[in-house]
Curated annotation (Swiss-Prot):
Protein name: Outer-membrane lipoprotein LolB
CC terms in the record's Gene Ontology section: cell outer membrane
Keywords, alphabetical: Cell outer membrane, Chaperone, Lipoprotein, Membrane, Palmitate, Protein transport, Signal, Transport
InterPro entries the record matches: LolA/LolB/LppX, OM_lipoprot_LolB
Lipidated residue numbers (S-diacylglycerol cysteine): 22
Disulfide bond residue pairs: none
Function: Plays a critical role in the incorporation of lipoproteins in the outer membrane after they are released by the LolA protein.
Originating species: Citrobacter koseri (strain ATCC BAA-895 / CDC 4225-83 / SGSC4696)
Chief location category: membrane
Lineage: Bacteria, Pseudomonadati, Pseudomonadota, Gammaproteobacteria, Enterobacterales
Pfam families: LolB (PF03550)
Gene Ontology annotations of biological process type: lipoprotein localization to outer membrane; protein transport
Length: 207
């Protein structure tokens, strides 16, 4: 279907949303080998998580637009997840619900859109080419389909480089939340050319 040319409202940044380097268990020292048993065990532990949720600050920055928001990400089952973007006043600007074969997005005017690919739809409706299909793995600290990545000294992802469909995404992790088991990302930045996506996770609930 042809999707309308909708643009997410530009949200005013607040001091509370400034994304700074995380000091929670930040990566340091020389990286570890991707072939290490500790890394394989960490991946297995993360993949066992069936349900999880996280919330925090989101920023999308490019030559054309800057968007700052709060986000809430909830996964309720395999390939079933919900993404909310809210403004500083707490009002919902975008709600996306995805399940296999069906994606629904509701904008800040209550307009509902449906499609079968979340990544394509959110890109067309908001003008933000967010790599949702890969981000679902990256936000967990997993490389997804990427084969070019490095680990930190705690056998967790430190950097990912992924090339697909003319995009060259680089993902850098600058902190992990060690209060959760397994440790989950607390700060990450995605970049492709002049585009940057920053995520700062306030907390995680994992099951």
């Amino acid at each position: 279907m042809t999707l309308p040319d909708f643009r997410l409202i530009r949200l005013l940044p607040l001091a509370s949303l400034v994304l700074t380097a995380c000091t929670i268990n930040a990566p340091k020292g020389p990286g570890k080998s991707p072939d290490s048993p500790q890394w394989r065990q960490h991946q297995q532990d993360v993949r066992k998580l069936n349900q999880y949720q996280t919330r925090g600050a989101f920023a999308y920055i490019s030559d054309d637009q800057k968007v700052y928001a709060r986000f809430f990400w909830q996964q309720t089952g395999q390939d079933r997840y919900r993404l909310l973007l809210t403004n500083p006043l707490g009002s919902t600007e975008l709600e996306l619900n995805a399940q296999p074969g069906n994606v629904q997005l509701v904008d800040n005017k209550g307009q509902r859109y449906t499609a079968d690919d979340a990544e394509e739809m959110i890109g067309k409706l908001t003008g933000m080419p967010i790599p949702l299909n890969s981000l679902r793995q990256w936000i967990l600290g997993l490389p997804g389909d990427a084969t070019d990545y490095t680990l930190d000294d705690q056998y967790r992802l430190s950097e990912v480089n992924y090339h697909q469909d003319g995009k060259n995404w680089k993902v850098v992790y600058s902190g992990y939340d060690s209060k959760t088991q397994p440790a989950m990302p607390a700060n990450m930045e995605l970049s492709d050319g002049s585009q940057r996506i920053k995520l700062k996770m306030d907390n995680w609930i994992v099951k």
